[in-house]
Every structure is written in C-alpha cells, then in structure tokens.
C-alpha cells in the first residue's frame, strides 16, 4: 500500500487538555489550509487520567486522498524531553531555625533531629527520599543545636555501616561567621542560608549540578524527586514548586498559589489572612480532584519543596534579590512575575511537623490500620542509624494499635494507641494510652537499676503502676512508680521545667533526662 509522509512542524508548549489538566502539548501543521493537532494519549493512574508529554501522534484529515487516509507514515516520537539525570541535580536540606513551635523537643536538638516513629529522626525523611530517588549529592545546612543532628548524619549516611553514597556525598554546613559586614550575621532565613553557602557549588564535586532541589527537614512524606524534577524539565521551568490541595482549616499556615491552565503559577501569597486568604481560593479540579474533593480543598498550598535551575537560583539570590532572606515570603512571590514558575501536584500523604500538636498527631497516626503513612516500603525504604539492638522482650502485655521499637523490655503492661521507642523499659502495671515514648540512648543493667532503687532514686524508664495518657516522653526520662500523667484538669499551656514537664496544646511533654518522682500526679 502506498503511504504518504507529511512534514510536521512541531512547536512544543503547554495547553489545556480537558477540564482537569494543566499539562499538555500541542502539535500543529498546515496542510491544504488545515490545522493538524494531536492530543496526548492518556493512561490511568490512581483512577485519574495522566498526560504523557514528549510524544507526537499523527491525525488524519478529510482532505487527504484515500491512500493517505488508510495509512499515514509518521515517527511516533518526533521530540522527547530530556530525561532527569540524578548526576545533574543536588539537594539542599534546610536544618530549620530555632524550632520555637516544637519547643521543648527542640531545647537541646535541631528540628530535623527530633525522633519520630519509634526509631527514626525527621532528617531521615528527606535523606531517604533523596537516596530512593537516586540523588547522591546532598548538602545539609544547620544552625541551632546541631550536635545530635551531625552525629546522626555521620553515623547513618557517611561512615562505617551507614549508607554508601558511591561517588556522591553528604556535606553538612553549620552556620558560621566570616570577615566582612555580611559575614557577621547568622542565617536570616531559608534563602539566606542557601546564599551564604552558594560557593560550595563552585567545588569540583558540584560542577555538573544543573538543578537544585530545596527540601525542609521537618516534613513527613514519601516522594520520588525524579518525577518532580522531570516535570520541571518537561515544562522548561526556571522554578517548580511542589504543591498539595489544602482545606480551609489549615490554609492560612501555608504559602498559597493560583495557577493558569498550563500549571504556571500566576500569583503566590505566603500565609495570607482574612480577605487575602479568601481571595486565594481556586477551583482545584484543575489538579485532577473530583468536584467533591475540590469543595473540601479549595486552596493550592506550597509544600516548601522547590526545584531551581542552578543559574536562576544564583541570579535570584545574589543579584536580583540580595536582601531577600526567605523563599516562601520573598523569593518565590518575586520570581512569579518574571520567571517560569510551575506547580507540581503531590497528591499523597504529606504533613508539616512544625508544631507539638502536628508532631503528636502524626506520630500516633502511624499506629492506625491501615496507616495513612508508614515507614516500611520494600521499594522505597526509610533509612536510619543502625543500632544493632536485640528484639523487644514482652512479658504478659496487652498491646493494641501500637508500635514498639527494638531493644525494649515490657513487663505486664497495657499499651494502647501509643508508640514505644528504642531501649524503653516499662515495669509491671504500666498503662499507656495515646502516648509517644521516644526511648533511651543507653541501657542500665539490672544491678544498676537495683542500686538506684535501693537509694530511692528513679532509673531510666517507667516504674510500676504508672498511668500515662496524652503525653510525649522525651529520651532518657526517668518516671517513678505510681505516677499519673493525664492532665485531668484540661490545662492547655503550662511551663514547669523545674518539675520536668511542659504542657502544649493540652499535651504533656516530659523533658529529656527529666526525673518524675514516685507518686506524682500531673
């Protein structure tokens, strides 16, 4: 059969494809005065259509002769977007500020070093996501209380039995002061932290870095950064912001955006209030949400996760906005009007662990069945420090909807909807309900425990017949026998550091290394 081939001029750009899409391609040509256009094939992903960029398809028109109608010779891939290459991307993990909203958990540690899920730390989330995404060039910027964070990173990701990075690296940069007026200042914000260490990208190890992923160290989620970065490449973006649908109750806590039908961000407002908040409502069906889901989530919120072209980031930080110190409130809103800033939908579990309540709720949510998020996944595991602890020993305990980490000793205890961290010791008669116990950094031998009890002192762990509810117990806490921690008076806020505890949002927090004497009622 004879076949005809048509020369097709391809102009790749974004267009609306259907009501619920903002990523598409248009292919057009002029043949006998007719426009030839092809839409993307669609595949099903989680029950929604997903466009496949980078492939052109031919479409027959009525003014071809019959032989052409029957068969049109074409190349199925007239153009393809470059594929994301992990060797060309580096990640910067922001260690966070003083962590005042997570105080007192951050009184002696940086936010990313806060324990979570029984045996992990918050920094393990972005680090594991990077490893699972193939990113092996990672910079971590720290400033406050960074000792335990640095120790955890060194043990887990750099040396000995930690994760092997091959020709990649993990570099930890602590805030420093240098000669000159500007060098006398500590980090003034997220953008300023990156600005102060931008010289690191001139190093030979970083010379091939074309794109930079900016990550926070206090979020809980599982994400393939390569898919995120591929969207960045496909749309030829200068900056791409990862976003999620957001409801009314929490919208004012985040940066909110409006996007056009191509996915380009046309307006960005950081934590708007009142009428400014209402003005940021959008039809989120454009993200692929159902009408019902869109009604419940009328905002598009930034996750605080960004991809920048390296040259664009350098231009913004050092030349265009040298006095702007924060990405969310200054750099991104300023760049929206002059750069191609794209939105990337992340429609999966994500939580900002920024407050005591969100930290507490996110931890206890891990005990649900099925959980909204879980650390174990055979294809994308989460990594942490190898402790080489023995299995937990359980003696006549009742454990319901809970997580018990390794190396624990539990004797005739009742544990409901709670998390018990590594090396925890619970004596007989202990009752936990809605409680997170972070565990201990060390063991005490039976002889040491007996000696302490003989002297009227309290060993590490929880003593006999103690009842604890709605509580966070920080590491190495010593809680005596017959103690009751329940906040039965419903106190919302209280500071009792001399007594070893705080109350935040109605949640009792037992301090690290604190001692709670026998019989105390909180």
Swiss-Prot record:
Activity modulation comment: Activated by 3'phosphoglycerate, inhibited by orthophosphate. Allosteric regulation.
GO cellular component: amyloplast; chloroplast
CDD domains: ADP_Glucose_PP, LbH_G1P_AT_C
Swiss-Prot/TrEMBL GO biological process terms: glycogen biosynthetic process; starch biosynthetic process
Localization (cell): Plastid, Chloroplast; Plastid, Amyloplast
Class of this enzyme: transferase
Associated pathway: Glycan biosynthesis; starch biosynthesis
Subunit relationships: Heterotetramer.
Protein's UniProt name: Glucose-1-phosphate adenylyltransferase large subunit, chloroplastic/amyloplastic
């Amino acid at each position: 059969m004879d076949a005809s081939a048509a020369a097709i001029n391809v102009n790749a750009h974004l267009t609306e494809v259907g009501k619920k899409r903002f990523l598409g391609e248009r292919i057009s040509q002029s043949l006998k005065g007719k426009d030839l256009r092809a839409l993307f094939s669609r595949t099903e992903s989680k029950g929604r259509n997903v466009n496949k960029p980078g492939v052109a398809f031919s479409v027959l028109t009525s003014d071809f002769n019959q032989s052409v109608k029957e068969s049109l010779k074409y190349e199925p891939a007239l153009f393809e977007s470059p594929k994301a290459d992990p060797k060309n991307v580096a990640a910067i993990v922001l260690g966070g500020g003083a962590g005042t909203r997570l105080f007192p958990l951050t009184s002696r540690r940086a936010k990313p070093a806060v324990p979570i899920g029984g045996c992990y730390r918050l920094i393990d989330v972005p680090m594991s996501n990077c490893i699972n995404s193939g990113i092996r060039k990672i910079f971590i910027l720290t400033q406050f209380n960074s000792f335990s964070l640095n120790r955890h990173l060194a043990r887990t990701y750099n040396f000995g039995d930690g994760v092997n990075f091959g020709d990649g690296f993990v570099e930890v940069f602590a805030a420093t002061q240098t000669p000159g007026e500007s060098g006398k200042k500590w980090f003034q914000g997220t953008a300023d932290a990156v600005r102060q260490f931008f010289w690191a990208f001139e190093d030979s190890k970083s010379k091939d870095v074309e794109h930079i992923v900016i990550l926070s160290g206090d979020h809980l989620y599982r994400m393939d950064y390569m898919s995120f970065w591929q969207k960045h490449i496909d749309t030829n973006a200068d900056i791409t912001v990862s976003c999620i649908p957001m409801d009314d109750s929490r919208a004012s806590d985040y940066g909110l955006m409006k996007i056009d039908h191509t996915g380009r961000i046309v307006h960005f407002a950081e934590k708007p209030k009142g009428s400014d908040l209402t003005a940021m409502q959008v039809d989120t069906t454009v993200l692929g949400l159902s009408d019902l889901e869109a009604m419940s989530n009328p905002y598009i919120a930034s996750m605080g996760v960004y991809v920048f072209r390296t040259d664009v980031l350098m231009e913004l930080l050092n030349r265009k906005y040298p006095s702007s110190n924060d990405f969310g409130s200054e750099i991104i809103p300023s760049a929206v009007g002059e750069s191609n800033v794209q939105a990337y939908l992340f429609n999966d579990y994500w939580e900002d662990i920024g407050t005591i309540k969100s930290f507490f709720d996110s931890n206890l949510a891990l005990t649900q069945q099925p959980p909204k998020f879980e650390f174990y996944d055979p294809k994308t595991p989460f990594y942490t420090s190898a402790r080489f602890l023995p299995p937990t020993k359980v003696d006549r305990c009742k454990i319901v909807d809970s997580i018990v980490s390794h190396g624990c000793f539990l004797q005739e205890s009742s544990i409901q909807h709670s998390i018990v961290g590594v090396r925890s010791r619970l004596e007989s008669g202990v009752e936990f309900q809605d409680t997170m116990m972070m565990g201990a950094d060390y063991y005490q031998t039976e002889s040491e425990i007996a000696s302490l009890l003989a002297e009227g002192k309290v060993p590490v762990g929880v003593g006999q017949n103690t009842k604890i509810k709605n509580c966070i117990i920080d590491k190495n806490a010593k809680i005596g026998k017959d103690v009751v921690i329940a906040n039965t008076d419903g106190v919302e806020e209280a500071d009792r550091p001399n007594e070893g505890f705080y109350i935040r949002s109605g949640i009792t927090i037992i301090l690290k290394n604190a001692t709670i004497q026998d019989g105390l009622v909180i």
